[in-house]
Structures are given as structure tokens and as C-alpha cells.
Amino acid sequence: MEAISLYNGQRSAIFQSAKDFGSAGSIYMTSRTPRFTDGKKYNAKVTFKTGSFGVANPSVLFEHRLGEHVSGAFSSEYMYTTGKYKFSYKKKNGYDTTEVRKNGDVRALRAEYGVFGRMNDGEWKAKAYFYDSERGYPGASVREEPGKFKHQDRQWDSNFFLQGSFLRHFSGYSLQMNAKYAYDYLHYLSDPRLDVSTMYVNNHFRQHEIYVSSANMFAILPFWNVDVSVDFQWNKLNADLVDFVYPTRYTTLGAVATALHFDRFKFQASVLGTFVHERTKVANGAADDMQEYTPTVVMAWQPFRVADFNVRAFYKRVFRMPTLNDLYYTFIGNINLEPEYTNQYNVGVTYNRNFDKGVLLGLDVQVDAYYNEVSDKIIAMPTSNQFRWTMVNLGEVEIRGVDVAVQSNWRFCQHWLLDARVNYTYQKAQDFTKKESTYYGDQIPYIPWHSGSLILNGTYKSWFLNYSFIYTGKRYEASANIPENRAKEWYTSDFSLSKNFSWRKTVIRLTAEVNNIFNQQYEVVQCYPMPGTNVKFIINIEI
């Protein structure tokens, strides 16, 4: 993986697929493109990780030239862990129990191969990906009756996809095409002969997906671009269940966008059309067909020519259709699940400055305030098992929040460098579905009012020091904000130290990690305790 980018709303560039215009927030993962230096014809990297929970995690990466403008990359990884760890439950004037988390083992294999090509004013990529795993579900831990339930549920997954992309810039016109085929298999087993607390479930799910996309951008004037994008997606879900409806979904998306960029002012507007048709083998078993149009308006303004200070704002209407998993999976799916509609309002400021003198090299500050109106918000509520989540709608939700991100770069002497990043989020997400309910206006489940993180990356010659702090504040595990449903705030501190060694053309990096340094006993989801202090050791060899 070369880069991971997170966007609230959508990317600032209009040259993208139609699907990209439809997300309230997106994560973009960019595959690593091979780069060769000093006339090399290949790059190789071998990594091995081990540590707590019986972890064994070898991986290999091999990149090679296939021609002057074509290269290939093979990557593979195997991961095994017993998943066993101790955790503690304490109650004032009550029990003090230490247990061992069991049935959390994981065996996973990943393999992928990509081909990357460059051409005049363009590039193309193709990738094949395979993933196979088996894992156990530890299940919920009951405080008052520790060890009563064994939780022997198992899950097997196999995932495969082929995807390709083509990008070319012409005079006044740019073309981007994407295509993907994906196959996903899931086998879930719950056997009462192994765990008397459960019912017998032996489900097999198979999903197929075909996706094609074309984005076309036209340079009308030097300051004016227009984009027209069209996507088509086909999904099919099969399962060996009694009376299963075997759904097939056809989704067509079309987007028209325009962008104006002047000296210190930028403006974008787009309209996305979403057309969804479903059919099933059982009469009246499909969700209703949908046809929706959702607009977006984005603006950015730099008030001062001499300072990199910007004001930005956007409005976005989002339509979210429930996935086939949301609608049709056993124990999870809800055929009566309604689509989700969101109106997003965001205003923010950014400030960036580089310094020529002093220890502070650079400063980047981003502050955003937002207000979201959500109708029929889709949320997943945990049950007694990690596989069996329940999908439900919350009729009316209002979300008010502030995001703050500050990043700075420091040089204390010739070899001492420090990067620091602080993130803070305040979010008030209230449920206004039923005025007569006792929880009208309460915070929705599992959304904290306050959360944040601190990341420090220090470098001294060939030494690398990293510290990470994550905090999640008070929240509630159900719609009613009462003491019985309160989830405690939690925090973790992680630390790592690395050292590089060079020998001829080989670079060796040794890393030691300590996670959850202060052995915080916490739960992200009620009754699912997380690990305490744990360690990891990594050796990385690059040729």
C-alpha cells in the first residue's frame, strides 16, 4: 500500500468515478507503484513479525521491470495468531475476575500480483488479489458468570478480485476507465454440540460483483472544467438457506460536475443520479427500486494572497442504499431496512506555513464544523456474537460536530527530527425519531462526545521512535442514555522503536513495539474485552 487518504464529503478533484460523488466520507487506498533507482531491475522486501498471542506473520514483496515502461509486483502474506489473551473484570465491592480470551485464533493468507504501465500523458494498472482465512468468534463475555459459555463459532472467508484502470490525458480532454470483478465466499458455523448456548447454524454465502466506470473531463476554458462520469455495478448474492430469495441488484450511476478555479477562489458543483433495480427468485422478496438525484456544492477561498490561509465550505446530499448484506444476511439482514438520506453542511479553515528559521519547520492546521441531518440512519447493533449484528434504521438523527487536526514538523539539531499530529473530534449525534420515547434527543449508540489522538514520530540518524495515544470518551451502548447503558471511556498508548542497518545494497530494519503500555482494560463493544499490554517484534530486509 502506497497511500491511504481519508475525505469528509468527497475529493476536491471532479475527475473521478460517479460512485465517488455519492459518499458521505471516503477512504482511498492507493497500491504501491514500483520505483527503481540506480538502474536496478528489481526490488525485494522480506518481513517477519512475531509477538504476543502467538503471532507469526511473514510477508514478501518482489517488484521487477518487465520493460522500459512496464513493471510488475508480487506481494504475499501469511498471518497466524492464537488470539488468546488475559483480561480482567472488576466491580466495586464485588467480583475481581481474570479470564483468558479463547477461540480468537486467525489463519489468513493473502496473495496479489499487479502490473503497472506508463505511456505518454497516461498510465494503466491491473491487479489480481486473493485472500483466504479461517477464524474463531470469541463471543460475548458474561461478567457475572465467567467462563460459562465456550463460544466455538467459526468463520471461513475467501475473496478474489481482478481489477484494472486506464488513465490518459489528451489536449483539452482526460479519460479514466476502471473495471473490476469480485467474488466473495463466507462460511459460518455455529454448532450446539460444541457450545450448548447456541443454535445450529451452517450458512454459506457467495457474492459476485461486476463494476465498470468511465470518467470524462473536458477543459472548457483555462479556469473551467466539466466532468461526466457513468458507472454500472452488478451484484448477486447466493446462499444455501431455506426460502432464501437469491437477490440480484443492478445499479447505474451518472454524475455531471463542474469546477471553476480562479486566482484565490475555487467552486465545484455536481449532481449524481442513482438508479437501483433489484430482483429475486421469490415474489415480493426484493427491496423497492430506487431513483435518486443528489447535489453537491463545494467552495474554497484564500482571503490573503501572502498567507496560505483558506476558508472552505460544502453542502452535500447523500443517498445510501442498504447493501445486499444489510438486507439479506441471516441474523444480520433486514428486508425492511430503508435507504439512508443525509444532508451535510460543513464549514472550515486551513492554515499551512513553512518556516526558514528556528526549530519549527512546518505547521498545518485544519478546523471544520459540521451539521448533518440524517433520515433513516442505518446502524449496526451488536448482539451476543460478533457475526450476528442487527441492522436497524433510526428515523431522524441530527449530528453536530467539530474536527480539529494540527500537524507540525520540527528540527532540534542536524539529526533530530520530530513530526507531531494531534486530532480531536467533538460529536453530538442525537436521535429525534420518536418524541414520545424516553430517549428522544439522546446520543445514539456507540458515538462518543469526545475522541482524539496524538501521534509522535521522532528520527535520529538511523533510529526511529514512534508514540501513539488514542482516546475515546464516554458513550452509550443503547438508545437510552441511562447509567446501565453507559460505556466507559478508554485510551491506549502504543510505543515503537526501530533501527536501520545497511550492508552493501541491503537495508535491515529491526522494530520493537509495545502496545497498550499501561495495560488499560477496556471494551470497544460491550462484553467484548480488548487485549492488555502486548508486544511485537519485526525484522524487515530490503534489497
Task: Give the predicted meaning of each segment.
Residues 48-52, 78-82, 119, 130-134, ...:
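Transmembrane beta-strands of outer-membrane beta-barrel pores
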Residues 362-373, 390-476:
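Gram-negative outer-membrane beta-barrel transporters
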Residues 376, 418, 471-478, 486-488, ...:
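C-terminal beta-signal and adjacent terminal beta-strands/loops
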Residues 83-85, 98-108, 121-175, 181-208, ...:
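Flexible loop and strand-edge segments within Gram-negative outer membrane beta-barrel domains
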Residues 172-190, 304, 310-316, 340-400, ...:
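Membrane-embedded beta-barrel scaffold of Gram-negative outer-membrane proteins
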Residues 221-231, 235, 239-372:
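Structural signature of Gram-negative outer-membrane beta-barrels, strongest in the C-terminal barrel
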Residues 34-42, 68-69, 120-123, 169-174, ...:
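Short loop/turn motifs that connect adjacent beta-strands in outer-membrane beta-barrel proteins
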Residues 1-6, 14-47, 58-61:
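N-terminal periplasmic accessory domains that precede
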